[in-house]
Regions:
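C-terminal recognition in membrane/secretory proteostasis and scaffolding
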Residues: 1-89
């Protein structure tokens, strides 16, 4: 999805693995390459809740949302806090 990140749609297995509440929906970061420029912004277990005002329904959907703009607004949930980032893929 983004350079060095592996994400997956949140499901019950990933909720349990990362301690996510039942109502959390989106894409969870399940892998981060050490050399990824996004490693600090999107740590393991962070959930991409919204991209450009839309909740991603799949990895392909998220990719299309990111590619639709040169700079994208991304809201993530990490350690119980929602944070906002403007990123360039």
């Amino acid at each position: 999805l983004l350079d060095g990140l592996e994400v997956a749609l949140v499901d019950d297995v990933l909720r349990k693995r990362f301690g996510l509440e039942r109502e959390v929906e989106g894409l969870v970061v399940v892998g981060v390459a050490d050399n990824s420029r996004f490693a600090d912004t999107f740590p393991l277990g962070a959930v991409l809740l919204e991209i450009n005002g839309v909740s991603p329904e799949s990895v392909d959907h998220a990719r299309a949302l990111l590619e639709s703009r040169t700079t994208s607004r991304v809201y993530i949930l990490n350690q119980g806090r929602v944070r906002y980032f403007a990123i360039r893929p």
